[in-house]
């Protein structure tokens, strides 16, 4: 790395990322103290030293927070545009005025600059860039290749296992539905390898005709491999040939008076027809493509993405990128694409609803990244145009629903402010709940709601840690949750009047301090929360409301508790009551889900996990040899040493672990 006049000349990708993403607030502040400039004058000073080369620039405010990340074919020319005092739209004018420091990285090519820009925008969340929200990884279906009886699984994350991967699918529910159908059509197992190895009789899935039970050899290895081959062919787009083969097999079985087998083929055919009927539009001439369409209205953009693989429609997903209203739809779409594919596999063909700037550059960047040719196309006619139109209709309709929902939420938030006598309409509402069974596996949960709905990437869960809390003490649990939540907030950002309700790092337009706290509980819970808030000096900064069920615990008879006020109820048909119930129920759902996951993890905890040097391979060997953890615990030292991969030293550790307790 060569650094000269705040310009980094990096030799490799790692150096570029390291330099641009690890500058500290102190570094930026100290550098700005040296030049004593801000805004356009500051930028003019930097322009003097910039080369006529491609690269990435970063604009930083006085607090060291990144305002904007951009790329340029020519850094000197591009950044010079910001030195003019006039002629900019409101967004760029505000950005220039807030700039207190800049950082630069010179790259070898403009393609490198484009890829680096997308990576940094996703990592740094600059508030003046177009930001991709809800960027979850996509689920895949895998058929394993590392076992005599391949299994069918849902998969997310890295492709570390030896298997055939089919996807991406637009949603987890789409994968689950497809797997259910594949089970009915091809009878493949979905159990883990360890479960399969230790079964002595078929499970319930065999009884209901969802599995062929290779675990107990109810089917020969050869016949099972044929089922696996059929499932792979179907997922590869050869559905018609698979159905033709099944029809012939069904007729043959019926001709031989094997009506039970014929009925089985009939049911499998029905399952395949069912999934195809729910796939909507399927292309006839396109094997692999992603289709993007954007719709804009009232400053909000919706991008609809459809995934077509193996000639099949594998679902769609809607995105609402955060972008200033001054961005055009083509600018939003271009930025969205570069961020979207930053960590996702690329299809051969990408279809767009409208032209974007630097389309050729983006195609070259994607081709370089994928190590094969990637085409970006704006179709004018034919099947490709039909697919784009289909995506645009969906984007337009989804945006309409979003706008209606936002308008409804705005009215509801205004109503909440009026009912609870808040000083202003709340922007952020936090709802808390606890979940446990007689004090065991106790967890606290926090969900967050804003005017655009639930902000799920800001949900938080709290494992109750304190040993001083009596099992089942809901008040004590809530105290711990509130104390941990707001102690950390104060530690990181100071008190609300000091932080000026600064914005969340996950969403630059969303505050980190709640205007309203909702608690699932009555007077006791409210008093518990206020006790902690008083200790932290926060008692006067936010309103706390408790929602308690009525005497008969029926929905619609909730009582609301606010400190210093008489408890009250709302009319049973009041839409604000329904909304508050929905907030409460979402917190309850999240808390119960977290508790169940913790309880399940505890239940499935293997005693072998506590022993040093016992990894997955040795654990699998032990379970395969003995059949259960209980049998391992009662095994003799001599028996343990007979297990393949278990040395005398390891066997002694296992024996001591179970016999010294």
Swiss-Prot record:
GO terms for cellular component: cytoplasm; excinuclease repair complex. The keyword Signal does not apply. SMART domains: GIYc, HhH1. Residues 240-275 form the UVR domain. It is found in: Cytoplasm. Residues 52-130 form the GIY-YIG domain. GO terms for biological process: nucleotide-excision repair; SOS response. Keywords: Cytoplasm, DNA damage, DNA excision, DNA repair, Excision nuclease, SOS response. The keyword rRNA-binding does not apply. GO terms for molecular function: DNA binding; excinuclease ABC activity. Interacts with UvrB in an incision complex. PANTHER family: UVRABC SYSTEM PROTEIN C, UVRC/OXIDOREDUCTASE. Belongs to the UvrC family. The UvrABC repair system catalyzes the recognition and processing of DNA lesions. UvrC both incises the 5' and 3' sides of the lesion. The N-terminal half is responsible for the 3' incision and the C-terminal half is responsible for the 5' incision. NCBIfam families: PRK00558.1-5, uvrC. This is UvrABC system protein C.
């Amino acid at each position: 790395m060569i650094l000269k006049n705040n310009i980094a000349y990096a030799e490799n990708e790692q150096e570029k990322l390291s330099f641009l993403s690890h500058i500290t607030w102190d570094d930026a502040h100290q550098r700005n103290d040296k030049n004593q400039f801000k805004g356009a004058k500051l930028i003019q000073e930097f322009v003097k030293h910039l080369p006529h080369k491609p690269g990435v620039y970063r604009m930083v405010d006085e607090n060291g927070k990144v305002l904007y990340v951009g790329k340029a074919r020519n850094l000197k020319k591009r950044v010079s545009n910001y030195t003019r005092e006039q002629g900019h739209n409101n967004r760029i004018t505000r950005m220039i005025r807030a700039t207190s420091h800049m950082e630069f990285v010179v790259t070898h090519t403009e393609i490198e600059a484009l890829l680096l820009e997308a990576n940094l925008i996703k990592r740094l969340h600059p508030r003046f860039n177009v930001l991709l929200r809800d960027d979850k990884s996509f689920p895949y279906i895998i058929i394993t290749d590392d076992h005599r009886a391949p299994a069918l699984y849902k998969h997310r994350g890295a492709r570390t296992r030896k298997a055939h991967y089919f996807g991406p699918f637009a949603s987890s529910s789409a994968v689950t539905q497809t797997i259910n159908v594949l089970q009915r059509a091809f009878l493949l197992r979905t159990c883990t390898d360890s479960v399969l190895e230790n079964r002595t009789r078929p499970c319930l899935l065999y009884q209901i005709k969802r599995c062929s039970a290779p675990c107990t050899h109810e089917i020969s290895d050869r016949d099972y491999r044929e089922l696996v081959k059929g499932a792979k062919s179907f997922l590869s787009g050869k559905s018609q040939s698979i159905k033709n083969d099944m029809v012939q097999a069904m007729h043959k079985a019926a001709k031989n008076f094997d009506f039970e087998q014929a009925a089985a083929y009939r049911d499998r055919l029905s399952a395949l027809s069912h999934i195809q009927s729910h796939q909507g539009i399927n292309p006839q001439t396109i094997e692999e493509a992603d289709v993007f369409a954007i719709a804009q209205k009232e400053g909000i953009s919706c991008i609809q993405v459809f995934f077509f693989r193996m000639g099949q429609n594998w679902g769609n997903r809607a995105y609402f990128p955060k972008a200033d209203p001054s961005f055009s739809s083509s600018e939003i779409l271009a930025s969205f694409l570069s961020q979207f594919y930053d960590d996702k596999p690329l299809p051969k063909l990408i279809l767009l609803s409208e032209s974007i700037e630097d389309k050729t550059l983006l195609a070259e960047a994607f081709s370089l990244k994928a190590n094969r040719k990637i085409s970006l196309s704006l179709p004018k006619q034919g099947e490709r145009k039909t697919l784009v139109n289909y995506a645009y209709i969906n984007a337009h309709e989804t945006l309409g629903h979003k706008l209606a929902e936002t308008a409804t939420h705005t009215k509801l938030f205004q109503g909440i402010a009026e009912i609870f006598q808040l000083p202003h309409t709340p922007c952020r509402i936090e709802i808390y709940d606890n979940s446990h069974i007689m004090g065991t596996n106790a967890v606290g949960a926090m969900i967050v709601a804003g005017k655009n709905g639930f902000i799920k990437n800001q949900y938080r869960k709290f494992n109750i840690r304190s040993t001083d809390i009596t099992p089942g003490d809901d008040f004590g649990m809530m105290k711990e949750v509130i104390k941990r939540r707001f102690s950390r907030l104060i530690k990181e950002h100071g008190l609300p009047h000091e932080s000026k309700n600064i914005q969340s790092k996950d969403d630059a337009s969303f505050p980190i301090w709640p205007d309203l706290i909702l608690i699932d509980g009555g007077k006791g819970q409210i008093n518990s929360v206020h006790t902690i808030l008083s200790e932290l000096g926060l008692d006067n900064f936010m309103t706390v409301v408790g929602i308690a069920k009525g005497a008969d615990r029926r929905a619609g008879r909730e009582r609301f508790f606010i400190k210093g006020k008489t408890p009250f109820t709302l009319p049973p048909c009041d839409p604000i009551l329904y909304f508050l119930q929905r907030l409460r129920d979402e917190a309850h759902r999240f808390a119960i889900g977290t508790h169940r996951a913790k309880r399940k993890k505890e239940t499935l905890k293997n005693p072998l996990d506590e022993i040093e040097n016992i990894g997955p391979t040795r654990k699998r060997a032990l379970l395969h040899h003995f059949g259960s953890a209980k049998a391992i615990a009662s095994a003799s030292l001599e028996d343990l040493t007979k297990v393949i991969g278990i040395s005398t030293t390891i066997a002694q550790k296992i024996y001591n672990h179970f016999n010294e307790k």
